[in-house]
């Protein structure tokens, strides 16, 4: 179970949910050194992957969604470190990543649909999952993802749900009208994601359906739009508009995006760099759990998203 520290209602500032850290970091230096080594491997085959540049929106949406979820859990008095807090944080991360992905797709295709429709659709799916201790509700939306071997540390394993549910929300929607229940399904399989098991289900539902989260959601999507030029995300511009409060975590995801958008030639490459990033972060014991959760959620989405957008064709 993801164990994160939530803000109290008295000190939860949605624009600054984590204490600002110094940009100077041993861990970041090691990450930068790792990037340099990886990009020197077969440089003649490495180039910018346009599809992965689009997937950067998904990663940042999940990263920011996790940060928003931490504050939302605190605002609604959901017990710190409990299953309710984790469910709220993960739910916000799922919606943030999937909606950012859909919004980028919508903009690139010139669709007239509203992101509001996808937001309502996503909440509907999660609300239904909160009603049950089973995952049968998700079965019609299954697809057969590539088996992944990601080594998330103890306490962060449930962040895989952010990546998996990201794809299921997208595949379960009708891209031209995501508020409907039409499906886009690939090879239905009985591969269920864990249900939302928490004694705080009603609090979690209230938090996820709150105006407070909707305001944060709107801010994330709006700032992604404002920071996107010709389909490419200006990550520095985005974090200037929508800071998380952790310069260190922001810099870590920036470094990951540099490698993610240029190095991978297949999903196995993404899994490799994801595991290596996790190892670097864990071995230096410098980032706190809140920072790790944001980063790891983004990494999980980076593995799953290219599998539905066919970024390596």
Residues covered by each model-derived region:
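C-terminal motif of bacterial Sec signal peptides marking the signal peptidase cleavage site
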Residues: 3-6
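Bacterial lipoprotein signal-peptidase II cleavage site
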Residues: 8-15
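Membrane-engaging insertion elements
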Residues: 17-23, 28, 35-47, 75-146
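Hydrophobic alpha-helical membrane-anchor/signal-helix detector
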Residues: 54-68, 89-98
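Eukaryotic long, low-complexity intrinsically disordered regulatory regions enriched in serine/proline
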Residues: 67-72, 76
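Mature extracellular/secreted ectodomains of secretory-pathway proteins
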Residues: 106-313
């Amino acid at each position: 179970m993801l164990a994160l520290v939530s803000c109290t209602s008295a000190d939860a500032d949605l624009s600054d949910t984590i204490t600002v850290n110094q940009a100077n970091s041993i861990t970041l230096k090691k990450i930068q050194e790792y990037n340099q080594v990886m990009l020197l491997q077969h440089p003649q085959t490495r180039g910018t992957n346009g599809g992965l540049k689009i997937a950067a929106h998904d990663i940042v949406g999940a990263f920011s969604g996790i940060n928003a979820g931490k504050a939302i859990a605190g605002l609604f008095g959901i017990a710190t470190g409990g299953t309710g807090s984790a469910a709220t944080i993960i739910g916000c991360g799922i919606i943030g990543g999937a909606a950012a992905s859909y919004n980028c797709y919508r903009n690139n295709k010139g669709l007239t649909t509203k992101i509001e429709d996808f937001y309502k659709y996503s909440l509907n799916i999660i609300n239904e999952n909160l009603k049950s201790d089973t995952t049968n509700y998700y079965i019609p939306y299954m697809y057969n993802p590539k088996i992944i071997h990601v080594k998330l540390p103890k306490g962060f394993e449930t962040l895989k749900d952010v990546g998996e549910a990201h794809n299921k929300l997208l595949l379960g929607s009708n891209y031209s009208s995501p508020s409907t229940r039409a499906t886009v399904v690939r090879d239905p399989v009985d591969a269920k994601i864990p249900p939302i098991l928490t004694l705080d289900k009603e609090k979690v539902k209230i938090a996820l359906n709150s105006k407070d989260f909707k305001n944060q959601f709107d801010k994330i999507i709006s700032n992604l739009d404002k920071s996107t030029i010709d389909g490419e995300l200006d990550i520095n511009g985005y974090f200037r508009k929508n800071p998380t409060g952790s310069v260190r975590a922001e810099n870590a995801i920036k470094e990951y995006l540099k490698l993610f958008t240029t190095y991978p030639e297949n999903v196995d490459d993404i899994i490799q760099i994801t595991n290596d990033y996790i190892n670097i972060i864990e071995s230096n014991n410098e980032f706190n759990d809140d920072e790790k959760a944001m980063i790891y959620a983004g990494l999980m989405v980076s593995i799953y998203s290219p599998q539905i957008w066919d970024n390596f064709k």
